[in-house]
């Protein structure tokens, strides 16, 4: 989709979540339902030379937040986005020099309800799933519940 939306997201993250800059988190793609973001290993590694679990959690949380941000922007909606709850599972160590986390598309009915509540009440919530994976399967799966309020 629009590079301008990705640019807006990146600028917003750098301004509102400054930890994203030293972590090297970068918005890569947005197709209207799925956001991908990339992060380098080196500033986010642990003593085992694999990605630090806290950095992986932060990346997945930001991808979920960014997905909600872009969904709202795509409909001309705004609001304060916060994570209410997150659940993460680690399956294998991440050792690639750069790796990508991707949100999974939200169910269409759930998305329609999300938009309807924000328009009518100025308050809504949505669950977003995120994965870091390769051709062999997932490294990390994350599910976050996000709340939006005017």
Residue ranges and their predicted role:
Residues 44-71:
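A short mixed-secondary-structure module that forms the rim of ligand-binding clefts
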Residues 1-17:
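Extreme N-terminal tail/first-helix region
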Residues 23, 33-35, 77-86, 98, ...:
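A generic structural signal for short beta-strands and their flanking turns/coil linkers
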Residues 95, 105-150:
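HotDog/MaoC-like acyl-thioester-processing domains
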Residues 67-101, 105-107:
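Hydrophobic beta-strand-centered segment that forms part of the acyl-chain substrate-binding groove
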Residues 19-51:
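Catalytic strand-loop segment that frames the active site of acyl-thioester-processing enzymes
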Residues 47-51, 92, 115:
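Short histidine-centered beta-strand/loop micro-motifs
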Residues 21-25, 84-90, 112-115:
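Short structured motifs
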